[in-house]
Amino acid sequence: ILTQVIIPPQTIEKGVVGLQVVEGFVSDIKIQGAPRGDIAMIRRYANRLLEKGPLDAKDLEHVMLTLNDLPGVVARSVLSASVDQPGGSDVTIIVESDELYNVSWALNNRGTRYMGPMVFSADAQLNSALKLNEAIRVGIATAPDGHVDREMDFLSLSYKQPVGPYGTTLEGGFSTALSSPGYTLSQFDINGRAENYVLRAEHPVIRTRNKDLRVSLQFDALNSHRTDNIN
């Protein structure tokens, strides 16, 4: 996107004009702003542009989108001509801190007769609270119809950490659920408990404004048990 075609000083003979193509490239990366996260990680992401040679729009787009995928990061880029390298351009990346946390909650009556129908859920995420560009998430859900003897309680915890300069993330999570179905199943005094452990690695293969293709590898471990009075 920085390539230029210029007409150098010359004598035109027989109607033939010589053109000179100057392939534009990134000569320097500058980071501005005081993000809450790991500035060294942000620079490693941005330095990928120095490895590309002639700058391609899709390479710049990929770097900026993966930067903005980092929890707590809002980044934009500005291009300017290099003062000492012909054909070179400096890329200034202006980084700001996004919200420290995000919270959402919901209350609906779309549960089942056995666990519901009223269901309350809430999620909270801390963005780079440890200044590592990490995401820490907590989620809860409950079916409060039975009040003290609730029909369902759920809790989840997860930690996601970017690794390397290419948008790869590693995530570990834990969730636990307690269930005591009501309605016609209440006579069987069913009580269940389940614990789930998750390890997940994810990498963006294609990252553009219009396309997002990721590959992931996930390991799950489930431990569950149930008690009842069914003979």
Question: How would you name each of these model-derived features?
Answer:
Residues 1-111, 140-153:
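Periplasmic polypeptide-binding modules associated with outer-membrane biogenesis and secretion
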Residues 79-81, 105-109, 122, 136-142, ...:
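Transmembrane beta-barrel strands of outer-membrane/channel proteins
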Residues 89, 118-122, 153-157, 195-199:
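Hydrophobic, lipid-facing positions within transmembrane beta-strands of outer-membrane proteins
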Residues 95, 126-128, 161, 203-205:
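Residue-level signature of outer-membrane beta-barrel architecture
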Residues 102, 162, 167-231:
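Transmembrane beta-strand segments of outer-membrane beta-barrel domains in Gram-negative
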Residues 110-114, 127-129:
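Membrane-proximal, glycine/serine-rich, low-complexity loop/turn segments characteristic
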